[in-house]
A protein has these predicted regions:
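Paired acidic/hydrophobic, glycine-rich loop segments that form the ligand-binding mouth/hinge
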Residues: 1, 88-92
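Well-formed, non-transmembrane alpha-helical positions, independent of function
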Residues: 9, 33-34, 81, 99
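A late-sequence structural motif
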Residues: 107-139
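Short beta-strand-to-loop elements that line the ligand-binding cleft
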Residues: 64-75
Length: 139
């Protein structure tokens, strides 16, 4: 309930298209239509990453079943391995793939806009102060 909780913006996280480094999409900015011939690898139903992707896809006038093939995987590690091996493309947060030398990035209007991450805390407590202290630590 909004009366019990409050939140603040932690960061805006880039949401990017990912493919193998040698994939023709690597480094490009493309329209959604150019993705439909690809195998799309998505997170499992119920995951936030999948929800974001499906909402943006729907807003662009498309659905998962418009893709050549859809594969659902529950692990970021497995998705990255499949993408790096050239089996398909996916959409993940940039922070999940930035250090992976075998994965390339591409952008798509309407699909790869940044996503807001918020810290939610209980109102009328010291939770905000403690969360800010915790997040300020260089771990």
């Amino acid at each position: 309930s909004k009366t019990k909780y409050d939140s603040y913006l932690l960061r805006m996280e880039p949401f990017v298209g990912i493919c193998a480094k040698d994939h023709p999409l690597c480094g490009k900015h493309i329209p959604v239509e150019d993705l439909l011939k690809e195998t799309i690898i998505v997170r499992e139903e119920g995951s936030g990453t999948r929800r974001i992707f499906e909402e943006r896809l729907t807003a662009s006038g498309y659905e998962l079943n418009n893709f050549f093939r859809t594969v659902s995987i529950s692990s970021f590690v497995s998705i990255k391995a499949l993408v790096a091996s050239g089996i398909g493309i996916s959409f993940l947060y940039a922070s999940v793939v930035t250090k992976d030398e075998n994965i390339g990035i591409f952008t798509v209007d309407g699909l790869t806009e940044p996503h807001a991450f918020h810290v939610v805390y209980t109102r009328n407590t010291n939770a905000k102060k403690y969360s800010e202290k915790f997040l300020a630590q260089d771990v």
